[in-house]
Amino acid sequence: MRDELVWIDCEMTGLDLGSDKLIEIAALVTDAELNVLGDGVDVVIHADDAALAAMGEVVTEMHSRSGLIDEVKASTVDLATAEEMVLDYIRTHVKAPKTAPLAGNSIATDRAFIVRDMPALDAYLHYRMIDVSSIKELCRRWYPRIYFGQPVKGLTHRALADIHESIRELQFYRRTAFVAPPGPSTSEIEAVAAALDEGKDAPGPSDSASAPPTG
């Protein structure tokens, strides 16, 4: 098992594996300190008019607002090409298959579409997954102060932007939830969230549980 994490986010025409299409996939690899390695990759995949017309009203509005529908129509990239582009980037930073876990938010949904449409990519990833959404739900139940203090999400519903937000969210939990009791004060939680919002504070060894915040 390697320390790197492979972050993937997908945009689809819906959540039905039987009929909906994968129309965007992005990937970033991070090291053990959640630093992004390389530039990542973001690929918009072509879908025909029938697939786009079959989208529900909410999904259509979401992908129209983000500009994704227009990009999907203009794209000439098919699933096989997109899969190879993502694998090329991942292989640059993760040399051996089945050694780096998949990470993201509600990542099981994304992986289901990857299994269906990009089996070579799925096979390269370790079977383990790190789902930031699970940490969020645990904090909501056990550490509500941390849950309600988390950084605000942009909700762009574009794959690469969503990954950056997921990484930032895990940075936040690392520095507020994964520390020794009693954990950070409300003001310290707010300071961490503000620093991450401004993008000026990268995670590092000093963020570990060996030096818990006081208060």
Curated annotation (Swiss-Prot):
Region feature (Disordered): 196-215
Compartments where found: Cytoplasm
Ranges of residues in domain Exonuclease: 5-170
SUPFAM superfamilies: Ribonuclease H-like
E.C. number(s) listed in UniProt: 3.1.15.-
Active site: 127
GO cellular component, one term: cytoplasm
Biased composition (Low complexity): 202-215
Keywords for this protein: Cytoplasm, Exonuclease, Hydrolase, Nuclease
UniProt GO molecular function: 3'-5'-RNA exonuclease activity; nucleic acid binding
Transmembrane segments: none
InterPro entries assigned: Exonuclease_RNaseT/DNA_pol3, Oligoribonuclease, RNaseH-like_sf, RNaseH_sf
NCBIfam families named among the record's database cross-references: PRK05359.1
Its job: 3'-to-5' exoribonuclease specific for small oligoribonucleotides.
Family per similarity comment: Belongs to the oligoribonuclease family.
Record's protein name: Oligoribonuclease
Organism of derivation: Mycolicibacterium paratuberculosis (strain ATCC BAA-968 / K-10) (Mycobacterium paratuberculosis)
Recorded name of the encoding gene: orn
